Amino acid sequence: INPPVVLPTTKHSFVVKKLADQAPWIIGRAGMHYRDLIPDRLGGSIIASHIRIPDGGPVPDMVHYHSVGFQLIFCYKGWVDLVYEDQGEPLRLHAGNCVIQPPEIRHQVLYASDNIEVIEIGVPADHITTIDHKMELPNKTVNKNRRFKGQKFVHHKAEEAQWEKFRVPGFISRDTGIAKNTKNVAGVHIIRPEKNKSPETYHDSDILFNFVMEGNMILSGEGKEPFKLS
């Protein structure tokens, strides 16, 4: 049985979540700690989690896959060793780098540094995770151009990226290449300011998610009090 992925209609809202809010850490799969960044999940359309592994070392994970529409892993602090179907030998995901896990690509978390933290985004919020007891990784086939449900695996490395003007004046960004390789299912940019202030702007995305990695900023939303983020 392999039910289709159902993408719920997004229930749009303006949400700000701070680490200082003392949201609880929940112990989840393979002993990882999870903190929910979008509690209402916009009607089930998205889940965003802040994940940490306090004690580094081998991770008791198994080869598995997710039945999703989109999934991002962004390494915020530390590093983690991962292995993916058809992508060759294991890779080390360093802070500032990210991968997308295309729908149903088999993968496994192998080893983590102390106090690693990642941001994981999944669409939709509720999706099925399946253990693959038959596959061993790395597998013999290497096909880095393979598409999984129309999406290609992406491993974005900060040191190889180029900074360019962002769509919002006053910022520059590095494009991860995710939009191109998912056929615009999602896009991911890392941005930084060139100026202290930017003009009012808007977007036409279904969902826009921002995460402040370092520094601080003031976010003003229409009809909202300004939020200081850090």
Predicted regions and their residues:
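Conserved hydrophobic/aromatic beta-strand scaffold that supports enzyme active sites
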Residues: 34-36, 48-50, 72, 90, ...
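A generic beta-sheet turn/junction motif
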Residues: 41, 86, 111-113
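A short, N-terminal "cap"/entry segment at the start of jelly-roll beta-barrel domains
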Residues: 2-56, 128-194
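Short acidic-glycine-tyrosine-enriched beta hairpin
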Residues: 37, 84-105, 221-230
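Conserved, short, structured surface segments that act as functional micro-motifs
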Residues: 110-112, 117-121
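Short, conserved beta-strand element in jelly-roll/cupin
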Residues: 51-55, 64-82, 121-124, 190-194, ...
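Short histidine-centered beta-strand/loop micro-motifs
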Residues: 60-67, 84, 91, 110-111, ...
